[in-house]
């Protein structure tokens, strides 16, 4: 490989790294909301998996504890699915055109 080609690859890798950092910083600011029980339980989570808020409708507090626990778990899982989906969409623009191995997920 010629010196110029290597330098070009290094610049390209550095640019990609900077773009990945910007995308990850942007994802940290995105908040998604998972819910269950028709919106009776809601979980707000950043795309860095930080839970920001859990809201439980007061009508559930007098109900069955097991049901409430199931609804909270379902809301968390819904939020996680939304985080993964949003992250994949946002990172797709950064990784577009990069020759990544099949099944490789970013960020790592």
From Swiss-Prot:
GO CC annotation: bacterial nucleoid; cytosol
Keywords from the UniProt entry: Cytoplasm, DNA-binding
Domain of life where this protein originates: Bacteria
Subcellular locations according to the entry: Cytoplasm, Nucleoid
Keyword field contains Isomerase: no
Main location: cytoplasm
Pfam families (UniProt xref): YbaB_DNA_bd
One MF annotation (Gene Ontology) recorded for this entry: DNA binding
Annotated function: Binds to DNA and alters its conformation. May be involved in regulation of gene expression, nucleoid organization and DNA protection.
Family as reported in the entry's similarity comment: Belongs to the YbaB/EbfC family.
Assembly mode: Homodimer.
Name this protein carries in UniProt: Nucleoid-associated protein Bpet3552
Organism (species): Bordetella petrii (strain ATCC BAA-461 / DSM 12804 / CCUG 43448)
